[in-house]
Design a protein with these regions (language model features):
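Secreted/periplasmic proteins that engage bacterial cell-wall peptidoglycan
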Residues: 75-113
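Conserved NAD+-utilizing ADP-ribose enzyme module
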Residues: 22-72, 97-98, 109-189
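C-terminal motif of bacterial Sec signal peptides marking the signal peptidase cleavage site
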Residues: 16-19
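Bacterial N-terminal signal peptides that target proteins for export
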Residues: 1-9
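Alpha-helical transmembrane segments
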Residues: 10-14
């Protein structure tokens, strides 16, 4: 083997080896798209104080729905780095619904019909008669985004909403609760 050929192979080897030495830069969290190509009425608000954006495709998928099905139109996943206060309007006759999945960062105001329309909440899903507040636990993941449209019983339809909602994957039946320090604030509105 000639000197030129050995030098060339050595340089190629060094170049390939050097390319493997540096780890790739961390990937930015994926920017979620609207489901089914639907146009969302709003955008995802910035991370709330006490949260950082994370990538969790399974949780995001659980919070999104196609048009007419409620849930979120688009969203981003966050992880609580400090307790974060959230509010929930629910049905008092169904006590198990107090620790549900859908919350708000802002204290809800009435009237109930306006709140229902702004958040695309079908009447058969909740009577919206009781208000509670809790804090999202440190380390818990949640999704934030604008509401998807909802087709309800009796031909009631709510359009997609720019109002950001908070999805916390609570499941009290399975013992999975990601909120704490809950207080029932009473009848609503």
């Amino acid at each position: 083997m000639g000197v030129t050929r050995v030098c060339a192979l050595t340089l190629v080897g060094i170049g390939l080896f050097a390319g493997c030495g540096a780890p790739p830069p961390p990937a930015a969290p994926a920017t979620p798209l609207a489901t089914s190509g639907a146009t969302c009425a709003g955008t995802v608000r910035t991370a709330p104080a006490g949260a950082r954006e994370v990538d969790d495709a399974a949780l995001l998928k659980a919070a999104l729905a196609d048009p007419g099905q409620g849930k979120l139109c688009t969203g981003k996943v966050f992880e609580a780095t400090a307790p974060i206060q959230v509010y929930r309007v629910w049905t008092a006759a169904k006590a198990t619904t107090e620790i549900g999945g859908w919350w708000s960062f802002d204290r809800p105001t009435g009237p109930a019909t306006k709140y229902r329309q702004a958040n695309a909440i079908c009447p058969e899903w909740s009577t919206l008669d009781t208000l509670s507040t809790c804090t999202i636990k440190v380390g818990a993941r949640f999704v934030v985004g604008p509401g998807q449209s909802a087709d309800c019983a009796d031909s009631v339809h709510y359009a997609a909403s720019p109002e950001n909602q908070v999805y916390v994957p609570n499941d009290t039946r399975a013992g999975k609760v990601y909120v704490e320090g809950c207080q029932k604030l009473g009848a609503w509105p």
